[in-house]
Amino acid sequence: MMDAEKVSTDGEAISEGEVGSNGETPPETEVEFIGETAPDTDVEFIGETSPGTDVEPTGESIQETEVESIGEATPGMDVEPIKKTMTELNVESIGEETSETDVDSIRKALRGIDLESITVAYPPKKAKHRKVRPQAEVESTGRAAPEGELEVSDHEKVEALLDELDELSEIVSSPEVSYSDISPLEMGEDDTNVSATSTDTFQQGIYEPIEPIEPTEPPEPAEPPKPAETPEDSTVRAPAHPYQRDFPMGARHRFRLSIMGSLTPSDTDDLPLETDEPPQQESVQSTPRALEETRIQFLDQVQSLSPEALLDRATEGSDEAEEEGSQLIVLDPDHPLMIRFQEALKGYLNRQMDKLKLDVQELDVATKQTRSQRQELGVNLYGVQQHLARLQMQLEKSHDRHSLVACERRRKEEELQCARSVYNKTCQTANEERKKLAALQTEVESLALHLFYMQNIEQDVRDDIQVMKQVVRKTETEKMHAEVEKKKQDLFVDQLTERSHQLEENIALFEAQYLSQAEDTRVLKKAVTEAITEIDTIAVEKKRILQQWTTSLVGMKHRNEAYKTVMDALRECQHQVKSTDSEIEVCKKSIMQEEEKNEKLARLLNRAETEATLVQKMTAQCLSKQEALQTEFNTYQLALQDTEEMLNKGYVEHSAVLSELQATRQAFHQEQELRQKMDMSMVDKLQEQGTSSKMTKYFHQLLRKLQKENTNLVTHLSKIDGDIAQATLDITNTNCKIDMHKKTLAEMDKEVKRFNDLITNSESEIARRTILIERKQSLINFFNKQLEQMVSELGGEEAGPLELEIKRLSKLTEEYNTGVAEAQMTWLRLQQELVQVTHEREEQLVSVDQLKKEVHIMEQKKLRIESKIAHEKKEQKIVSRHMRDLDNDLSKLNMLLDKNRCSSEELEQNNIATETEFLRTLKDSERETIQMQEKLMELSEEKATLLNSFMEAEHQIMLWEKKIQLAKEMRSSVDSETGQTEIRAMKAEIHRMKVRHGQLLKQQEKMIRDMELAVARRETIVVQAEGQSKIDKKVITKTEFHYQQRELQKKVREMHKATDDCTNTISELEETQKFLSSSLQEKQQLLSEMQATTDVLEEEINQLTALKRQNLLEIVTLQTRGKHLQAAIEGKYVFLHRNSRSQLMERKRLSVRLSQLNKVLSSVQEDYPQYQEVLQSIQQKIATKLETPEPS
């Protein structure tokens, strides 16, 4: 019978022609068997396993006594046959579901099932009839009575055994055992004790169909939870979850226990249904008044759970739910805020327990009166056994068919899931390819636009080059024409002497022109000074500076051309005057030299001023860049130090958490071994002292303490696992940050090496060119000496060949001047391009900053979405598990209802007593469906609370992320005003949080008061319901019974619809999860592409800045070189230091400055050793410069 009792906790699906849960059994199968066996058959008691079933975890087997067939097993009444006939399939289904669990968890669960089956089958049933079979009909099965038989004449032995059975029923029927909110796993050991005592009692050969004596015991414990459940209820049920994971049927066992604990009246009320014979009907009609009172009390309890009462409780809980804003927080039972509520609930439960004890005493008196009637029930046992065997065979066949259909359905669902996954993957790849194509198209369009711009710029440059070439050709033709004319004038010198007087007049005219030109020069000087002041005032406006610069350069070009034409005319006049008067030529030469010196000085002044402004701008830019790089370096160094500290902290925390985890695991294993030992010892002691109620209560308390400690250890272990996961996540994040910093450091090292190479190359080039300049300067000095010597030999007059040499040299100087002019034009163009490049660089820097911010935001969103996805997966697993449980329960209910309809035709022939029994079973099934609905609502509320707590935690995480981001922005920001505004915003946020905290404290106090009022309200509702039930004592007719049956069928259909809706929502959540994963991958690809573009842009910016610096240095060197060469050619080069003393002073000043730079570099190396290799080469060059001996 153990298999039947174990399966009764879950197995409620029965086969064709089987008995339903509503108690509608055929007349021949309504006698409960407790201890009697049919002739020539062996009996299975509690603790033994039938060979026909597959239950192996109990570890017990029948040695020499076996059942000849499954159909000859011991039957009971309507619930007991269900338990026996459903043994094989339900145990097989349990074996399928628990294939991944270990034997220990299955053994614990089966112990809980044994307790439930005993509490349902045996303790509540007191004697209606009592009959002892003859000695020939009883056989001993492993643990038989001493003689193996019991005769009718041994009346004293029967009375002693009945007294022991009464004491056992009082133990099992106590509220501590039959309370519906205690899971089977929490009562496993008690179950074994009770089963042991019951087997010892039943082996004596007693037949005890029992009258229900506890219809009033389970009202409060079995009362369905209210829609707005208090936190106390939720916390009481919380520890059952870990067991549900170890054993998938755990949730169902717990639910079944609460249901079957409250269905005890229905199991025994079906007993009179077998009384088709007149003698049995008379015994049913002679039921005492106690039975009628228990039936009325049971109906009152069922009516207290009517839909109207549930709606009233739902409206009361909805008000509290609206105030909390659908954010229920489950408090710990040891929390100080729960003390007041627990005291109120304790007082209420104590009153209920006192009331129940009084009811039990009254019912014990009633059972003693009805004990003499229970012997009559064993007469029809053999026929019932034969009928039960046939029904069991039919049930096994139907279970086999059901398992085959279920396997086929599961296989089809797996194929459908594979097809869906393949389709989703193909859609995702197609979307990715489309997005890549769109990105490539946009990139091609941008490149085409860039190419068009570059072609336009190239065309403009070519046009400028062509214009410059035309100007050069024109000047060359003019020079050739002037040379031809000069040769003609040399041939006609004699004719020019005659025209000397005319030339004197021309000289006077030229002197007047000279005066006018001097005034023009003064005007030009004023204009130059005004231009300088305008350049200083318009330094901020870069565009206007470039425009005025180009116009001033064009004006200078025109003035230089006019000056060259005037100089050519003057030279011609001087040659004419030389032939007439040498003194006039000497004066003219001195005048011309002074004029040239004046003009050159003016040009040198202008160029020097422009160069000074350029140098100042470049130095300011270099200083700003240096400061920016210094700040960036400091920020990177601080970030690196922070990451290293965080990594060390993470390693320390990880090691600490691992040690704690190891210690808790060892403690858990020790506690588990200790618990097993205590279980075995308690089983042995309880088998020896089965009738001692005090010992059983003591062991109940010990078991509850051990179970509480076990649940606490499991919760602590789960918390430690979560901490370890969080620590590993932090470690991975810090490792990623360290890798990123290492990469940036390597890139910066590469850039420093590249800049060092450029500096060394430029220095070598400067040294080479200085050597060439010195050589050319020596050649120029040598030629000047030769020229002076030749002029002195000729007496101060120049001959024809010398004039030709001078012309050649003047041509060379003009060519150099044209080259300088071209270099100036190219320099202007480069300056314009530089301005454009700087604008583009600033725009790109702004875009890069924006992209970095977006990347950071996307990373945060990614982390949040991953956490949401993981949470949704967990919820889906939980919901799918509960949905499977509910589907199984609904399928079993449907089968029971089908059996109910089949048996209703036969029940119409029964009398008024059978109708009342059917009414009880109907109420039991209605209460079972209501409890299932309340269980579903309870699960939804738990899910809502978990979601709310998760949202709160996510909100806190977002707040901390926001604070961290604000701190980083405050550190990196330069503008103090923006930091002050953010600080004020943070203070306002802190103030709002404090106000919210005060509001939450008030709301918490209000909720505690509401909880206390809810306990009082519950008591008043129960009292009112009991009074109303006593007033409204009605006998339900047959039509009302059929109406209630139809209502139940309607509720079952609604439950089916609800399950369909749940499956639809699960599929929708899966689709949203797939969509989110695809979008996340797309955003990651977009982020990688944006990162690649930013890297390319940064490389281009670096190249452009290097090219800009190189061009600026080359332009400056070329300009200074051209100036010095022009002055050397014209013999107007002026040394910076006219004497050796000033030169030595300047050299000392430069050496002091170099020594200061050397000290600065050494201090920088000490402060920042990571840049020691970069600065070492510069310091060595400065040292070599300092070590070179000074020239004497």
Swiss-Prot record:
Superkingdom: Eukaryota
GO CC aspect terms: axoneme; cilium; cytoplasm; extracellular region; motile cilium
Coiled coil: 308-369, 425-451, 581-649, 733-768, 830-871, 919-972, 1044-1118
Keywords, sorted A to Z: Cell projection, Ciliopathy, Cilium, Coiled coil, Cytoplasm, Phosphoprotein, Primary ciliary dyskinesia
Compositional bias annotation for Acidic residues: 27-45, 267-279
Location in the cell: Cytoplasm; Cell projection, Cilium
Pfam family of the protein (one): BRE1
Organ and tissue specificity: Specifically expressed in the embryonic node and midline.
Span list, region Disordered: 1-78, 126-153, 173-196, 211-246, 261-289
Annotated positions of the Phosphoserine modification: 306
InterPro entries named in the record: CCDC40
GO biological process annotation, one example: motile cilium assembly
Major subcellular location class: cytoplasm
Role: Required for assembly of dynein regulatory complex (DRC) and inner dynein arm (IDA) complexes, which are responsible for ciliary beat regulation, thereby playing a central role in motility in cilia and flagella. Probably acts together with CCDC39 to form a molecular ruler that determines the 96 nanometer (nm) repeat length and arrangements of components in cilia and flagella. Not required for outer dynein arm complexes assembly. Required for axonemal recruitment of CCDC39.
Protein name stated in the entry: Coiled-coil domain-containing protein 40
Organism whose genome encodes this protein: Mus musculus
Gene: Ccdc40
